[in-house]
């Protein structure tokens, strides 16, 4: 977003924060409305209005970008304000707001911690405010995955340094807890891309999780491409940082394997059978990132392989483009 557009959108957000109370029910009479400029993944900035009710621990944020575009296209202000008010009410009534979790209490949130993988260079500013672990050119951060009992919404909260101080917990303990948790976002899935495509077009079929102990890898071992994510397909690229997942991948692909960063939600596993070179794979990743992946969901422009001695992923030098990366 260029500076002029961001300023105009922020002015609009300030007018929303000032007047939106007039479009909301009586319970919002004493609510506080504050304009927030949020730094998302890979430097993407979004402007929203935060709603704070005295009796609530969670303060939903409604982003105003799409509503600002409606105004610029000529939609009546009153109509757009009513739409914003409706979004605020829905956010305030979402299951995660009333699930009894207090973000200020570590004991309340610790079982809902999970790990997210982001690009270090593209998130330098954000990472200054967050506890993180460096893994090659990537960084692991923690977030709270608020549970929901329906499909009405999803909420997460990235853990910042200020949270650790408030919780009186160190980063090492938090990361250990996050990786030990058993919620769906911590449950890895490895699927053959061939099976996944067949299951999409065949409603009766389904792709097998090849990490399950009772699955016969057998005939699937000759496939060229596999997708690794988690059950919820949310920030599933972090599964590649789990030691037990890497150990299982080493068993399935004893000849070695490459890791292609599809997005923050998924990585692709390519067996190292000598048919694909890191340079070619790196070019493929950059092409897909440029044309197919939303900027804030891009993980990396590089390819990784598995270091059997260190039991972790490492960058493949031949896959690295010799120009500035991730600065789109």
Stretches with model-predicted labels:
Residues 1-39:
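N-terminal alpha-helical "arm" segments
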Residues 8-16, 72, 76, 80, ...:
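Short amphipathic alpha-helical segments
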Residues 28, 92, 96, 186-190, ...:
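Residue-level signal for secondary-structure boundary elements
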Residues 31-227:
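Charged, alpha-helical interface segments at or near domain boundaries
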Residues 231-328:
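C-terminal structured domains
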């Amino acid at each position: 977003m260029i500076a002029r557009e961001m300023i105009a959108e922020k002015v609009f957000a300030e007018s929303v924060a000032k007047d939106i109370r007039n479009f909301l029910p009586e319970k919002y009479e004493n609510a506080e409305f504050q304009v927030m400029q949020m730094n998302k993944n890979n430097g993407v900035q979004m402007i929203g209005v935060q709603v704070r009710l005295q009796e609530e621990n969670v303060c939903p944020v409604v982003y105003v970008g799409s509503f600002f575009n409606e105004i610029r296209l000529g939609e009546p202000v009153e109509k757009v304000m009513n739409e914003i008010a409706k979004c605020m009410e829905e956010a305030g009534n979402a299951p995660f707001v009333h699930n009894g979790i207090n973000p200020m209490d570590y004991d309340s949130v610790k079982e809902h911690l999970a790990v997210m993988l982001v690009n270090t260079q593209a998130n330098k500013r954000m990472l200054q405010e967050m506890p993180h672990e460096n893994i090659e050119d990537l960084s692991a951060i923690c977030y709270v995955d608020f549970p929901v009992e329906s499909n009405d919404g999803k909420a997460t909260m990235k853990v910042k340094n200020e949270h650790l101080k408030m919780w009186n917990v160190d980063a090492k303990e938090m990361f250990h807890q996050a990786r030990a948790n058993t919620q769906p976002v911590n449950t890895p899935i490895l699927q053959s891309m061939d099976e996944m495509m067949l299951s999409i077009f065949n409603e009766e079929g389904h792709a097998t999780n090849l990490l399950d102990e009772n699955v016969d890898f057998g005939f699937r071992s000759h496939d060229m491409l596999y997708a690794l994510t988690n059950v919820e397909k949310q920030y599933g690229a972090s599964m590649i940082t789990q030691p037990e997942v890497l150990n299982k991948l080493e068993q399935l692909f004893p000849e070695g394997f490459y890791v292609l960063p599809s997005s923050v939600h998924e990585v692709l596993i390519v067996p190292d059978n000598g048919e694909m070179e890191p340079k070619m794979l790196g070019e493929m990743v950059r092409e897909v990132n440029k044309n197919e992946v939303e900027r804030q969901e891009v993980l990396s422009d590089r390819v990784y392989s598995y270091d059997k001695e260190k039991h972790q992923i490492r960058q493949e030098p031949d896959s690295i483009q010799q120009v500035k990366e991730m600065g789109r």
